[in-house]
């Protein structure tokens, strides 16, 4: 089985590649990552220790994935996930998040490849989320039945980042219908763990821990600066 992990030197991609390599013996894993994000070159070294090759190419370009040849499964982990960055560098975020999906799908239809696409909870409407009732007392366990699920509204404004991921989801569905491709979409929430290079705009919990270890100040913006918001962490 030949697996290509797009964004394989990122936080999720590298951990997935290493996990799969250790768990499945008869498997060929390729990482495709242009190493544009800080810390990705460190993850490339981790992959190399397990003989996982990284192809340093821009996935949004037409020929990058075609040159790799037949792939049985694409795991698409690549994206530009920062909300603030999507406001400042809109064209770049669209290229990194949407065009990469398009190139993957054009190759998948050629070889009838399966697809796992990591999307985001940011596809949901910010306006409708802000209308939800809020409370500050979480001394008792909150009601898990009041969670936001995949049926929540996605038709209103969310963010440029969320829009690129939602467009990618819809394009995958269209390709699946037209070319009978099998796919799975996971709308990830807050993800944290080893080898996450936390920054203020992405990797919140790693960033938070780093700040505490270094005894640096943290600025909370939720609930008027008190930081009382509750999030799920995977």
Name each model feature, range by range.
Residues 1-189:
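N-terminal Rossmann-like NAD(P)+-binding domain of SDR-like oxidoreductases, especially those catalyzing
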Residues 37, 197-204:
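Short acidic-hydrophobic sequence patches enriched in Asp/Glu that either
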Residues 86, 148-159, 183-197, 208-233:
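A conserved pocket-lining segment of Rossmann-fold NAD(P)-dependent short-chain dehydrogenase/reductase
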Residues 97, 101, 201-206:
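Amphipathic alpha-helical segments in well-structured domains
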Residues 118, 203, 229:
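A conserved catalytic-core signature of glycosyltransferases
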Residues 202, 233-234:
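Alpha-helix initiation and capping sites
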């Amino acid at each position: 089985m030949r697996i290509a992990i797009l964004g394989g030197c990122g936080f999720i991609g590298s951990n997935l590649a290493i996990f799969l390599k250790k768990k499945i013996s008869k498997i060929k894993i390729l990482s495709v990552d242009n190493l544009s994000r800080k810390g990705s070159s460190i993850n490339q070294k981790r992959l190399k220790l397990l003989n996982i090759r990284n192809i340093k190419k821009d996935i949004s370009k037409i020929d990058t994935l075609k040159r790799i040849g037949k792939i049985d499964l694409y795991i698409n982990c690549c994206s530009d996930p920062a909300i603030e960055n999507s406001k400042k560098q809109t064209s770049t975020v669209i290229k990194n998040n949407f065009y990469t999906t398009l190139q993957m799908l054009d190759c998948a239809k050629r070889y009838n490849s399966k697809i796992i696409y990591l999307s985001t909870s940011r596809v949901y409407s910010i306006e409708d989320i802000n209308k939800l009732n809020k409370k500050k007392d979480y001394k008792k366990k909150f009601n898990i039945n009041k969670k936001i699920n995949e049926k929540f509204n996605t038709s209103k404004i969310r963010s440029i980042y969320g829009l690129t991921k939602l467009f990618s989801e819809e394009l995958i569905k269209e390709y699946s219908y037209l070319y009978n491709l099998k796919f799975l979409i996971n709308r990830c929430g807050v993800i944290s763990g080893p080898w996450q290079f936390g920054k203020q705009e992405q990797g919140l919990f790693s960033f938070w821990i780093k700040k505490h270890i270094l005894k640096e100040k943290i600025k909370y913006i939720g609930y008027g600066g008190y930081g009382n918001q509750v999030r799920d962490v995977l």
